Amino acid sequence: MRISGAEAVIRCLLAEGVDLVYGYPGGAIMPVYDELYKFQDQLHHVLVRHEQGAAHAAQGFARATGKVGVAIATSGPGATNLVTGIADAQIDSTPMVCITGQVGKHLLGSDAFQETDIIGISTPVTKWNYQITEASEIPEIIAKAFYIARSGRPGPVLIDITKNAQFDEFDFSYEKCTGIRSYHPKPVLNLQKVQEAADLINNAKKPFIVFGQGIILSEAEEQLKRLIEKSGIPAAWTILGLSALPTDHRLNVGMVGMHGNYGPNLLTNECDVLIALGMRFDDRVTGKLATYAKQAKVIHFEIDPAEVDKNVKTEVAVLGDVKEALTALIPLIDKKAHDSWHNEFKEKYKIELDSVINEELAPTNGKGISMGETIEMINKHSKGDAIMVSDVGQHQMFACRYTKFNSTKSNVTSGGLGTMGFALPAAIGAKMGRPDREVVAVIGDGGFQMNIQELGTIHQTKVPVKIVVLNNEFLGMVRQWQELFFDYRYASTVMINPNFCAIAEGYYIKSRKVTKREDLDAAVAEMMASKDSYFLEVMVEKENNVFPMIPTGACVSEIRLS
């Protein structure tokens, strides 16, 4: 079958099972959009309002479904506008394929209109990228792109296609990629290392499990549950590990990290064996590396060899797919309870409950609405069944600390890059990927204005996303740091905001503003009952700080409750 390169792009996407893409047309990608028009009954294109929105929507889709998200843009600024989303996907291991148009082959390097070296620009933030200059390359390269994006430790791939390659015709055939000779995404599991890990775990007096997004990416949630229930080991999640285990599981002791729970952070430095499952020991988890878990023997289950011993020295490294590794490990583990060790976590939780949590979820200080009680009200009406999409800042930490999760792939947030403006487009992608689930986007007044234009995408597509803006009229997280570490010098963190509800109404999205605590319950109930998109602005306490907190560069044992 002889077809154009542009048609080949569409047929390749369909062959990979893609039925939804996010993008924004432009000159260098117009041949592909012309073919999209012809195939619109098979491949739905969502017109975003900014290419960064396309990247984040593709991320949200991927995070909520486990499938590869796809974003399309033109050359020049279209391509560069994708880069922040690509970088976010890279550090958070999100499978994504981005397709960009490029000037014709004969114009490369001539500084032609809307020409940028997107391959050079994106190299540090992609798992792989490639520029196609001949139509005949398209099937093989796109097949490789999807294989690389989803295999091993997932990540983003960018394919740049010159305009001549889109127009030229060739004899088309497609074969999915199942392997690349020089690329080995999944290390072969070493059963001797699994046995060594089991021996350490069985002999431990105070073992502690910290699990990350690797559990979700590997779909190892059931293996995690079986391991902790058999071993009796307390388990804590990282910010991207949220929802891999139900919040109310009896062995779930909370979240580690800068704004995680008091007990898991403090007791990291008291455990004798630390078992890390599908997480990368980033600085927000470890605090001061020189003092992190130095008393413990560390076991690291990890698919990416580059992460082993990168930050934390391990006693045993088990390389490979974490689902496969845990399946091999569980039969070797002794059944235990570790009751006295669990009691230490319970004691620390009681301290946090009395000093932080109770007041945050049900304030008695006479001040305004807290972010925590707003999240708790969402829990009340979602019953833990919603997908929570959070932006970046204080509200993100409150959402991650207090959202109730019943099932996996329910937490979508920007973890490693910390990208403000992530949540609104990511929520669009999450809802389109999982139309059977309620999707709630919780956003600060600062981050909301970074991609506020995607309200237009919601209006055009009628995707029923619930949007909650927690408005404290500050860049709250920066302000908190200025209060604690810069003697209340609030430099450029005060926000003079527009009428958000009027803007939402301008996009024909029903809106409501809450300024009084007594109105919060009814407003959240109305939002969650709506079958359409809904915008809820909650005016929260202006200087509502998020605690506990490990100051930057401090030891996890120096976690502050106030």
Region roles according to the model:
Residues 99, 107, 113-114, 309-319, ...:
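Thiamine diphosphate
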Residues 24-26, 45-56, 71-78, 133-134, ...:
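Active-site nucleophile and cofactor-binding loops and adjacent substrate-binding regions
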Residues 154, 219, 369-373, 422-424, ...:
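A generic structural signal for residues located within well-ordered alpha-helices
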Residues 158, 300, 389, 442-443:
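Generic enzyme active-site microenvironment
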Residues 136, 174, 295-392, 517-526, ...:
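Phosphate/pyrophosphate-binding active-site segments
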Residues 6-19, 27, 32-37, 350-425, ...:
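Active-site diphosphate/adenylate-binding microenvironment
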Residues 1-340, 377, 381-384, 464-469, ...:
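N-terminal alpha/beta PP-like core and its mobile active-site loop of ThDP/TPP-dependent enzymes
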Residues 160-165, 393-395, 541:
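A glycine-rich phosphate-binding loop feature that marks nucleotide/adenosyl-phosphate handling sites
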